[in-house]
Amino acid sequence: MWQLKIGADTVPADPSNAGGWLSSLNNHVGRQVWHFHPELGTPEDLQQIQHARQRFSDHRFEKKHSADLLMRMQFAKNNSSFVNLPQIKVKDKEDVTEEAVSRTLRRAINFYSTIQGDDGHWPGDYGGPMFLIPGLVITLSITGALNAVLSTEHQREICRYLYNHQNKDGGWGLHIEGPSTMFGSVLNYVSLRLLGEEAEDGQGAVDKARKWILDHGGASAITSWGKMWLSVLGVYEWAGNNPLPPELWLLPYLLPFHPGRMWCHCRMVYLPMCYLYGKRFVGPITPIIRSLRKELYLVPYHEVDWNKARNECAKEDLYYPHPLVQDIVWASLHHVYEPLFMRWPAKRLREKALQCVMQHIHYEDENTRYICIGPVNKVLNMLCCWVEDPHSEAFKLHIPRIFDYLWIAEDGMKMQGYNGSQLWDTAFAVQAIMSTKLAEEYGTTLRKAHKYIKDSQVLEDCPGDLQSWYRHISKGAWPFSTADHGWPISDCTAEGLKAVLLLSKLPSEIVGKSIDEEQIYDAVNVILSLQNTDGGFATYELTRSYPWLELMNPAETFGDIVIDYTYVECTSAAIQALVAFKKLYPGHRRDEIDNCVAKAADFIESIQATDGSWYGSWGVCFTYGGWFGIRGLVAAGRRYDNCSSLRKACDFLLSKELASGGWGESYLSGQNKVYTNIKDDRPHIVNTGWAMLSLIDAGQSERDPTPLHRAARILINSQMDDGDFPQEEIMGIFNKNCMISYAAYRNIFPIWALGEYRCRVLQAP
């Protein structure tokens, strides 16, 4: 049976750490790892798990998102004495009473407290993308470490996950709810084959997948990221790739297209890619590789036109078509530049560039304790370390950190989009519980969460000359996940700061000692340092180049990846944090904070669409963007009666309320940039929570509280017997076109919305 271990408990039981390869800044606070124990679990436990797996499989085409049941079952067993308050429902014609809301809130927080980790964070599923596991399987296969690193049970659960998320037509999407793409289909088909699955396995699912691939043009039509993965594996030729010259890293930084000016996720993915391309690395050609060469193409492998394949992309994948200028650049590099740099004397410069690239790879690895910024560059960096030296310490240091990314639920084992969302979820959870004015009843929960947030702050900048490594300051920031990950993010810093400021208002006997004042000042310094000239805030760093650079975005599947753009979410979070800080510390950098908030609020108004909406880039979508837009403007001092932006925003949200009450927004809103309801106009508890919070902040209860009453009824009636809330459609998004799971949102936002509703609507004078 699988068991989730958290924090320091992950280390002694980790067989991959036999040589002491794991390091940590804070004794692994926030680390979450699943271990398999063959002797663990009663027959009843195993039957319950099997039932959950079967139920998911039976309904996988209607309900594509797991409910994180394995984790919940484990916590339920650990809290077997837990008995919640009786459930309550509100009938259609019945008024929503304070008693009904209060009981729903207590039931919700009671339950949510039972699934909190011992270190204070809330573990959960951060999966969703379908192109992550293949990179891991391919890397481990090439390095010969597949069976040594992934046990039979790991491999079985990965196969379960891939089969469960295969679409009816035989293909796989970019993410769990998406239609089939060549990128998803080829990589997941290859993964199953590398894991030992044959054509007849999965009740014919493997053969069905191959048919989808061939019916849609074969693997030559895979996207550029897919071409790269297939090339290193040996089932696609490097001649069929557009160039990724490592010499870009040797160019002067003043050039607007220098990699150091790119969004950090973009540059950290293309950094190892250009190393592998520059070396034209190909893994061992084994019998399975020879077989895949025959299985994936419409013509014999030696007859594929690789030059033509460079720019081929299946129509199902084409979200961002290459502009003509890009095709001209790639053709010039491919036909003129690359032949020169593969020969002496220019090859000497190539070797120098490759050395430079590896220095940056090692810097990233060492400063994230080999977690890396995300799962794509994690496995690519690991592969590069092996290519550089198969016996290197760097490669061995990578191995135990693989498990930081693996998560298991009733749908199988997935690779998460980060090493978790620990800090982000915990900061939101604190604010949600505090909004209820019931905080003193949940002192233990808040104390643990407070400790997690304090333990997760980044206490030092990265070593060395930050400018040389293209890094922003980190000291005082909060990361998205753990301190060991360590990459600083503007909105995570803001939400972390908001949470500790709220908790500082409660007695230390209840929630523990407040964070040191200097650490709060450091967080404020990070936030102020991240404001761009347009007044907005980007994610990890300042915006370092120009939007026209997006013309060179080579990833056909994703939008807005080349530079770190400014976002309503990051800007709003910064405003809220600085305003909250100023109330408690009015004398610290007051003028700077006032100027920053004023510019940021103007930015939020300037990017509002004419219909009153804000596009949410990190959540689905206009309800999410609207929540941040409204909340930021209100924090900055705007009011409904003196701000047309707020009036338009409220009108927009109210126009999207469903006839049944509540809001339900499909992921298609983000992809197509047009507000789209969930199928059958069903409400979603998370969208409903965001819309409620927005309208309450904008004073809707003073004008007409009816939509809020309807929404509250939806949330109350959605609560389950045990106090949990149901997992509904996927609610996270990145790069316009890919969705990601935020499993904690189903608990956080009903609590937060009903908390604000109870205190600011029902208890309003």
From Swiss-Prot:
UniProt catalytic activity: (S)-2,3-epoxysqualene = cycloartenol
SUPFAM superfamilies, per this entry? Terpenoid cyclases/Protein prenyltransferases (SSF48239)
Each PFTB repeat occupies one of these ranges, namely: 155-196, 520-565, 597-637, 646-687
Task: Alphabetically list the UniProt keywords.
Answer: Isomerase, Repeat
Which top EC class is given? isomerase
Q: Name one GO biological process term.
A: triterpenoid biosynthetic process
Q: Which GO terms describe its cellular component?
A: lipid droplet
The protein's GO terms of the molecular function aspect are:
cycloartenol synthase activity
**Xref: Pfam families:** SQHop_cyclase_C, SQHop_cyclase_N
Enzyme Commission identifier(s): 5.4.99.8
Additional record remark:
In cultured cells, CAS1 mRNA expression is high between days 4 and 8 and decreases at later growth stages.
Its annotated function is as follows: Oxidosqualene cyclase involved in the biosynthesis of cycloartenol.
The protein's matches in PANTHER family, at most eight in alphabetical order, are given as: TERPENE CYCLASE/MUTASE FAMILY MEMBER (PTHR11764), TERPENE CYCLASE_MUTASE FAMILY MEMBER (PTHR11764:SF85)
Q: Which NCBIfam families match?
A: squalene_cyclas
Task: Name the family.
Answer: Belongs to the terpene cyclase/mutase family.
Stated name of the protein: Cycloartenol synthase
Q: Which organism is it from?
A: Luffa aegyptiaca
